[in-house]
Structures are given as structure tokens and as C-alpha cells.
Amino acid sequence: MVPPRWGSLDSLKPQQHLPMTKKGILLAAFGSGNRQGESTLRLFDERVRERFPGVPVRWAFTSVIMRRRLAAARKKTDSVLKALQKMWFEKYTHVAVQSLHIIPGAEYGDLVADVEAMRRDDGFTAATVGAPLLAGSGDMERSAAALLAHLPAGRKPDEAVVFMGHGTRHPAESSYEALAALVRRVDPHVHIGTMGGSRTLDHILPELQQGGVKGVWLMPLLSVVGRHATEDMAGTDPESWKSRLEASGLRCIPVLRGTAEYEGFVDIWLDHLTAAVSALDD
């Protein structure tokens, strides 16, 4: 190629530059206000940075109550929309948002709506969403395998395992039932219930009594350990799951570890994020 001569019109033409691409990742969790939960999210953050070196990672909490509670403790956190707006202001063009929710319920729907809003009106060039833990049949099978792989090692033959999820009136509540059905095919003494869904401890207690079990390992089906796990599940209040199980004559052993503390579950979320990051280039 012959360089333009001095004084030629070619030398005055503006250079054509492709728009700069700036990628980022936003991790969206329900929220956490205790050390264990914060440690769990920090370890998840490290796994994400290992898989996507050089890609900035931000956080958002989807729970309004959790954000207010943290604000009262002078800990600033962002909603999904606020975090996305900050990333847009910082000139990010491609953003992958990963949900750390268990099911695609109402909060996940709000997250998707926030991302969609930032796609419109001269927003991001591309914005994608990574699915929650139980988003499809493949996820169900992998989650069932992870759940069974992480059952307590010290469990005895006469002991059941009961997992407590959050629960919702959203149609995605059926995700818990689908997971429970897969697990029961392998181990009929593993039960999955929720605090406020269609299958609660009221439904599980008679099954435990009829099954002849003597003890129960109680585990949260929640991303991180927070008040639901420490109080609603394993607390001393008469209405906690632990208290009710003990009142029915069953010995109860709580295990306070969230699903984001187990590699088998974390790998599913990371694979969803990988798909979301790859889709940014489509």
C-alpha cells in the first residue's frame, strides 16, 4: 500500500476505528449479612475470576430487605439495576449477569427485566443473563447428583436428610418438586421442602414418621447461610424446623452450609455464566 502524498485528500480522511469493547460480569445474589455468607460469596467471586481472568466482576443483591439491613449497618450494596447503570456509566459495552438464585422465580424475573431495560434506549451493546441453579432438565439431573454427592458422611441407616428451600407462589416452585422426584429415585429418605411453597415441613413430617427414621439431618437448599438457615431452619424458636422435628421425637442434626459452598452446585452456576459470556459475542 502506497502511503498518501502530502497534501492529498486521502491524508485528510478520518481514520475508521471499530468501537471499543469493554466486557464485565455482574453476579446477582439474594444477599448476605453474616460472615459465613460473605465468605461464601467471596469464594464464588474467586472461582469466577479464575475462569474469566482479566474480566472485571461486580456484585448486586436482589433482596430489598437485605439491602436495607446492610445499609442500616453502613454497608453499601447495589440493586441489579443500580449496578448495571454504574457499569454503563463506566463505559462497559458487554455485560453478562449471573443469577445465584436456586429457581427462576420472581426475583430472577425482576433481574431479567432489569437487564432487558438496559439493552434498550442506547444501553449496552450486549447484555446476557446466566440461568439460576434449577433452570432446565439438565440442571435438575446435575443438581440431583450434586445433592446426593454432598449428603452427610456420618449419616446412619435410620436417618433421613431434609433440605429446606425458600419457597414461592411463583410457578417455578415446581422446580423443587422436580428435583425432589429425581433424588427420591435414588434415596427415598432424602426430602426437599420449602418454607412457604407447596411442600412444607407439614407434608414431610408424616412421611418421616411412616418411614421409621429415628433422626434427621437438616440442610439448607439456599445459596448462602443467612437468617433463614440459622433461625427458620436451625433456630431455637418452637416453630423452627429443628424444634418441630425434635418435638415429634426425632433427633435432629443441622448442617449450616449453603449450596454455593459445594463444588458440585458451583460448577453448574459457572457453566451457566460461561454460556452467558459466550453469548455476548453472538
Curated annotation (Swiss-Prot):
Under CDD domains, the record lists: CbiK_C, CbiK_N
Binding, Co(2+):
H166, H228
GO biological process per UniProt: anaerobic cobalamin biosynthetic process; siroheme biosynthetic process
Catalytic activity annotation: Co-sirohydrochlorin + 2 H(+) = sirohydrochlorin + Co(2+); siroheme + 2 H(+) = sirohydrochlorin + Fe(2+)
What InterPro entries does the annotation carry? Anaerobic_Co-chelatase
A molecular function annotated in GO for this UniProt entry is: metal ion binding
Catalytic residue list: H166
Identify the GO cellular component terms for this protein: cytoplasm
Function comment? Catalyzes the insertion of Co(2+) into sirohydrochlorin as part of the anaerobic pathway to cobalamin biosynthesis. To a lesser extent, is also able to insert Fe(2+) into sirohydrochlorin, yielding siroheme.
Query: What does the sequence similarity comment in the record state about its family?
Result: Belongs to the CbiK family.
What's the protein called, per UniProt?
Sirohydrochlorin cobaltochelatase CbiKC
Which species is this UniProt entry from? Nitratidesulfovibrio vulgaris (strain ATCC 29579 / DSM 644 / CCUG 34227 / NCIMB 8303 / VKM B-1760 / Hildenborough)
